[in-house]
């Protein structure tokens, strides 16, 4: 979502509330009601995207492409960027990275043969540069070409998505993951998180946070389940429109910062507080949306 859309959305929501007669205790009403609206928006973004995706995936042309590759001990950073589609990354034992990428046609026209031809000309590479490994799907023979722009130029369409399921060894400890439209799901990863989404939800399970980490979504809910944070680490979680749910391990020691411009905060006071005596910084903030800490 472009930055100028946020104040427009905020103004529209406030106007809607005022027009409906919600003038008593306006501040409380706006905080609560818009927070609920933001939660609904986040849920709707996730549910609608999932339902539409599932609908097309049940009937559309698709192709799965697999990659398994050993990586050296010098590689520590995973980079994966996606325009449209879901990303799932999970930790595993061993010294190989495994990738399953599925291209899905989102077009119900009669061009199935063209979509199949496009998919047959796609491949995945995992390119190592220094300490970074980048996963990329591209047309065969040209790793630098973007799939969507290439398909638009070659076939006249770009109405497809790419879903990634990636398993990585625990020698990788920095995760640069981004998506424009789609869900991001990360599980059981130890390291530094740099995760961003424009439209769609983010879910992180079993996280062990190291270093300075950031997780953000412009439109969509964020769920983080944190098992551990190193003493010198910090984690900032932010969404423009959508809710944040943080599940913290019972023994986790953190210094918590919470802020919501418009929306409720439950499970911790607004502002700063210490959990289990304090520790590394955990910052949770929303522009429009609620925050829940458990």
Language-model segments: residues:
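Solvent-exposed beta-hairpin/edge-strand motifs
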Residues: 104, 119-121, 257
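Short, surface-exposed interaction patches in beta-rich subdomains
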Residues: 205-294
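Short, charge-rich amphipathic segments
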Residues: 45-56, 187-196, 215-221, 236-238
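Short acidic/polar N-terminal linker immediately downstream of export determinants
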Residues: 3-7, 11-15, 22-98, 104-111, ...
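Solvent-exposed coil/turn segments that connect beta secondary-structure elements
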Residues: 83, 92-94, 102-106, 129, ...
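Right-handed parallel beta-helix
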Residues: 65-73, 77, 86, 90, ...
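A generic structural signal for short beta-strands and their flanking turns/coil linkers
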Residues: 95-97, 131, 162, 211, ...
């Amino acid at each position: 979502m472009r930055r100028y859309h946020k104040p427009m959305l905020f103004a529209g929501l406030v106007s809607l509330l005022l027009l409906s007669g919600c003038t008593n205790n306006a501040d409380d009403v706006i905080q609560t009601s818009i927070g609920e609206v933001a939660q609904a928006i986040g849920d709707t973004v996730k549910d609608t995207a999932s339902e539409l995706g599932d609908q097309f995936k049940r009937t559309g042309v698709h192709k799965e492409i697999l990659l398994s590759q050993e990586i050296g001990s010098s590689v520590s950073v995973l980079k994966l960027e996606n325009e449209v589609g879901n990303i799932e990354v999970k930790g595993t034992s061993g010294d190989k990275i495994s990738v399953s990428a599925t291209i899905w046609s989102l077009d119900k026209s009669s061009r199935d043969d063209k979509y199949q031809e496009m998919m047959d000309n796609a491949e995945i590479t995992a390119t190592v540069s220094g300490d970074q490994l980048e996963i990329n799907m591209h047309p065969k023979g040209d790793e630098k070409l973007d799939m969507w722009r290439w398909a638009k130029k070659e076939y006249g369409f770009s109405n497809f998505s790419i879903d990634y399921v990636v398993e990585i060894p625990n020698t990788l400890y920095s995760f640069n993951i981004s998506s424009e439209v789609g869900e991001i799901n990360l599980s059981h990863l130890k390291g530094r998180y740099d995760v961003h989404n424009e439209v769609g939800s983010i879910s992180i399970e079993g996280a062990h946070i190291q270093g300075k980490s950031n997780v953000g979504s412009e439109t969509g809910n964020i769920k983080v389940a944190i098992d551990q944070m190193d003493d010198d680490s910090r984690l900032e979680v932010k969404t423009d429109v959508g809710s944040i749910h943080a599940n913290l391990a019972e023994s986790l020691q953190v210094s918590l910062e919470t802020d919501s411009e418009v929306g409720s905060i439950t499970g911790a006071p607004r502002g700063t507080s210490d959990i289990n005596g304090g520790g590394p910084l955990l910052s949770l903030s929303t522009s429009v949306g609620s925050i829940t800490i458990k």
